[in-house]
Structures are given as C-alpha cells and as structure tokens.
Amino acid sequence: MKRIAIYADSFNGKVGQSLAYMNFVGLFGIPRLVTPQDDPQEIVDSCDALVIPGGADVNPLRYGQVPHPATGRANVYYEFMDAILAPKFVEAKKPIIGICRGMQSLNVMFGGTLYQHIKGHTQGSDRTATNQTLFTPSGKNYKVNTIHHQAVQKLGTDLEMIGATQVIEGCNSLYNQSGLVSVTGKDDKGKDVEFYAFVEAFKHKTLPIVAFQYHPEEFNCPFAIQEINKVLNPVIQEENEQDRQEVPQVTEEDTKEGN
C-alpha cells in the first residue's frame, strides 16, 4: 500500500490529527503523521504522497499582502512544513493533495493570491453540512460542505480550476467583485446558470497535484476520491481509460445479425 504523509497539528500540548483526516487518507494508503522535527528528505524518500490538511489562515505576507484585521493567526507548524517539506514533494514530482487551507497554501506556493476574509464563512460552521453545489467541467454537480475563511483570488501558475461554488450573498462585501471567477454551469434541474464563483477545486496542469477548498474528509466526497485517485494512480487511470475506449460498441444492427 502507498504511504501517505499528512501534516500533524499541535494542540493542547500534544501532536496529532483529526480522525476524519486519518480515516480519509486511509482510503488511499497508510497515513503517516509528519512534524517539523522529522527529516524532510527522509519523508519524501519514504512516502508516496503528501496531504496538506485544513487549518488556520495562511500568512498573507507569503503572497505580498498586509494582513486584514480579520485574518487569523497563522499555524506555525503548518507554515514551517509548507516552506520545508511541500517544495521537496513538488521537486520530486510526487502527488500532493491539498484540503481547505492546504489548497490555499498550494495556490500561494505557485504564485497565487487569496481573499483574506470571507464574510459568513467560519470554522465554527457545521463541517458535515453539504449545503453548497460544486460545479465541475464535466457538467456533473455535487453537494459539498464549503466552509472557509479565506479563498483563492488569483490562481497560481499552471493551476487549473476543476470545481467552483457560487459566491453566497454578502461574501463579496470586502473586495472587488471583478476579481471573482465568472462561471457558467447547469443547476440541479439542468438549466444553464451564470454566476460569480469561488475556485473550489483545482489541479496542476503537469504535476500530480490536486486540491479542494471544501472538506471531503467529512463525507468521503466521490468527486474528491475520483480526482485523488487520478494523481495517486495515474497508470491505473490511463489503463481504465484505454479499456473503455477499446470496448466494442454493440449496435442495434449487431444484435439483429446475431439472432
């Protein structure tokens, strides 16, 4: 099985990670908690992938902005591993999965910026409530639990949006709406809709990197599982695609000839 590194968090004088994250990572391999005290090169050499989980706000100084008054205190543990560990996985071209803060941090690593304060989005919200619609390029929609104090503003270099959620009323009060992404999709009834959106998921165009703004670990989101498997098992995905293309298509004429 694959060994998948995931940032450990520090709280109440202890180091650990939530059961939801550990169980979710366990769907894809064996989780390994990593800390700033670990040797980053040993982690890269011994692990097949890295998960950057959710957490506190990303330090705005990393993307050249002055902290907003409502911007929270950065997680020093996570910021250190963002600087020391994550770039080594990028350099090694090993898979990286970002969730919530992890997505924001990856965006910043590739030169992107963030909206620092999203009104109405707090970590005190119900993390299991799938109350927003995720629009994807395939046209298939998913219900997701999007709760995030910050969000992608400008996408980083070579990052491509693969999911978007509609900006809820009141969220854009602190920044220029022209900076938001305009998206056209289909609603739950199949009707075309156009709206301002948050980037809710992205992938890297050439590297095995995928990230989600929402929290797929709370409900084992099928879209996230599908996209994560694409970066963790690209050979299997390519073989499946090839198999689907090589399956003969039976037509009505074929069935008539066989009778």
Which positions does each model-derived feature cover?
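Active-site loop->helix "elbow" adjoining a glycine-rich segment at hydrolase catalytic centers
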Residues: 101-103
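N-terminal beta1-alpha1 cap of cysteine-dependent amidohydrolase-like domains
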Residues: 1-99, 108-115, 119-143, 149, ...
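Catalytic beta-strand/loop module used to bind and position nucleotide/cofactor moieties
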Residues: 211
